Amino acid sequence: HMAIPRIGQEVIVDYLDGDCDQPIVTGRTYRATNRPPYALPDHKILSTIKSKEYKGSRANELRIDDTTAQISAALMSDHGASALHLGYLTHPRPEGGKPRGEGFELRTDEHGAVRAAKGLLLSTEEQLRAGAGHLDRGVVVQVLEA
């Protein structure tokens, strides 16, 4: 994974084998003009990578929420209000975090498409804890043939 720092961000610099001619950026850090996405310590349970649109005001966000008994993950883009939410679904924690459901949600205010050249299995058949192959359809076939 490589995330190139943007102009104005503070970075942590180390040196390969202690050689000052071989600097390497090993991380980024926050400062007064580059604050964490959500207020601390109020939202200490959120691990977030949030970008800002170049010459714009929108953002993309990867958020991992480790709230006890309500863990979740989300990948979101302000463009089209598009998002993939996984786990315990809530409204954003900084806005109160009211429950919305459990499982997953893939949503957009724009168009969406699902493509699979070799086929697509869409089922409501239970397969707890991913206990079989992702294309396992034995039970589905049994139900259809019954």
Can you say where each PLM-predicted feature lies in the sequence?
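Structural signature for extended repeat/solenoid scaffolds and their inter-repeat hinge/linker regions
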Residues: 1-146
